[in-house]
C-alpha cells in the first residue's frame, strides 16, 4: 500500500513492551514483504500468533487445478452466467484460466467461508454483484458491487456474504500494487493518477473475537506453493487489538476510477488500475468518447504480440462486441497470436457516439493463459468465428 495507517491500540515506539490490561505483554507480529525490504505492518495480538496445535494436509479441489493450453489457438468466450457453483468464496471458486503468474476464478455463493491464508501471493477479488463482509486480522471491510478487494499475502481472512455474491478472483504469484507510474518516489499518488488515497478503504477498527470463541482452537486453511494445509491455531487469530504500517487489505470501487479521454481512441494502458507479476488489471468505465470530429470511438484491430487479454464484462453496453454473443457476465479471452478488434458492423454503428456505458475488468498477462475447468465448461463454441459472419 502507498500510505500509512494506524488502527486500534499500539505503543508509541515499535518493538517495545506493550502491556495488556492484565499485565501480560501483547505479542508483536511483523507482516512484511520482500524480506524486510518492502512494505510491512506491525500487529499486536492478545495471544501468540505462533501457537499452533495441529496441521494436516488437505486435498486440492479438482476444480482448482487441471488447466490445459489454449490449443488449438483461438479466441474464447466464457459464459459465467451458465456456470454451476457451490461452496464458499474460497473453496467454491471455479478456475477459469491461469498460468504461473496468476490464476483467475469465479465464485457465486451465499455461504460464509472458513478462515483462509494465501501464502503464495496477493489476491484481488472483484465483486460483480451483491455485498459481503470481509473479515481479517486487520479488521473489517464492507464490500459491494464494483469493489476490488486487495488482500496481502499471508492475511488470515474470511468472507461473510449478505445474500448471494458473484465475484471474479485474481490470485497472483507475488504482489498486486498500484502502477508505479501513478506514484511519487515516496509512494504518494500523483496528480495524473486516475484514483488516489481518498478512494481507498481500509479497515477502520480492529476485529477482536471475545469470550469462549477467542480461546478455542481454530482451523485455518493455508495455501502454499506445495499445496493446502489445515493449520489449527491454539486461539482464534482475530485477536489483534491494533496495528500500523503500509501493508493491509483495502477496497477500491471501480466507480471511483477517473477515466482518461483522448481526442482519438486511447489504448488500454490508460485504464490500468493495478499491476502484478507479469500481468496488469484495467478498469473500463463509463466515460465521454473521443472528440475528434472523425474519430472512430471504439478499439481498432490490434495484435498484442506479448500478452493475452482476458476481459470480464460487468455492466453497460460494450459496443465493440455487438453481435458476438457477449453479454453482462461474459468473459472474452483474446490470446497472443490472434488479431482481435470490433465485430463486423461495429465501427459504422459507433460513429458519432459521444459516450459509452461500458464497464469491464481486463487482465492482460504477459505469459499465455491456460484454460481451467470452468472455462472449458462455460465456453461458447461459436465465438471464434463471429468475425467471419
Functional labels for PLM-detected ranges:
Residues 1-389:
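Jelly-roll (double-stranded beta-helix
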Amino acid at each position: 500500500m502507498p500510505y500509512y495507517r494506524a488502527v486500534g491500540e499500539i505503543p508509541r515506539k515499535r518493538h517495545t513492551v506493550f502491556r495488556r490490561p492484565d499485565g501480560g505483554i501483547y505479542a508483536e507480529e511483523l507482516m512484511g514483504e520482500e524480506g524486510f525490504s518492502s512494505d510491512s505492518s506491525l500487529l499486536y495480538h492478545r495471544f501468540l500468533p505462533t501457537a499452533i496445535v495441529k496441521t494436516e494436509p488437505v486435498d486440492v479441489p479438482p476444480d482448482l487445478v487441471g488447466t490445459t493450453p489454449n490449443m488449438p489457438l483461438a479466441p474464447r468466450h466464457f459464459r459465467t452466467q451458465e456456470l454451476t457453483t457451490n461452496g464458499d468464496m474460497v473453496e467454491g471458486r471455479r478456475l477459469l484460466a491461469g498460468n504461473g503468474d496468476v490464476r483467475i476464478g469465479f465464485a457465486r455463493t451465499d455461504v460464509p467461508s472458513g478462515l483462509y491464508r494465501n501464502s503464495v501471493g496477493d489476491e484481488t477479488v472483484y465483486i460483480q454483484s451483491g455485498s459481503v463482509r470481509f473479515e481479517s486480522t486487520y479488521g473489517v471491510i464492507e464490500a459491494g458491487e464494483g469493489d476490488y478487494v486487495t488482500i496481502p499475502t499471508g492475511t488470515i481472512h474470511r468472507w461473510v456474504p449478505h445474500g448471494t455474491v458473484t465475484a471474479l478472483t485474481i490470485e497472483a504469484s507475488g504482489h498486486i500494487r498500484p502502477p508505479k507510474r501513478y506514484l511519487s518516489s515516496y509512494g504518494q499518488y500523483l496528480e495524473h493518477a486516475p484514483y488516489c488515497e481518498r478512494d481507498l478503504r481500509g479497515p477502520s477498527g480492529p476485529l477482536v473475537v471475545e469470550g469462549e470463541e477467542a480461546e478455542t482452537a481454530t482451523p485455518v486453511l493455508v495455501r502454499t506453493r506445495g499445496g493446502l494445509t489445515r493449520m489449527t491455531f491454539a486461539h482464534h487469530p482475530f485477536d489483534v487489538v491494533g496495528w500500523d504500517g503500509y501493508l493491509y487489505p483495502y477496497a477500491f470501487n471501480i466507480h471511483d476510477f477517473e477515466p482518461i479521454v483522448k481526442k482519438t481512441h486511447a489504448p488500454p494502458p490508460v485504464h490500468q488500475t493495478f499491476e502484478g507479476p507479469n500481468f496488469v488489471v484495467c478498469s473500463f468505465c463509463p466515460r465521454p468518447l473521443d472528440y475528434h470530429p472523425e474519430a472512430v470511438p471504439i478499439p481498432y484491430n490490434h495484435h498484442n504480440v506479448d500478452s493475452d487479454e482476458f476481459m470480464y464484462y460487468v455492466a453497460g453496453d460494450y459496443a465493440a462486441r455487438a453481435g458476438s454473443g457477449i453479454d453482462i457476465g461474459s468473459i472474452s479471452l483474446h490470446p497472443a497470436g490472434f488479431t482481435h478488434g470490433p465485430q463486423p458492423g461495429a465501427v459504422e454503428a459507433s460513429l458519432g457516439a459521444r459516450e459509452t456505458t461500458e464497464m469491464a475488468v481486463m487482465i492482460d498477462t504477459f505469459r499465455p493463459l491456460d484454460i481451467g475447468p470452468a472455462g472449458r465448461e462455460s465456453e461458447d463454441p461459436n465465438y471464434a468465428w463471429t468475425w467471419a459472419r
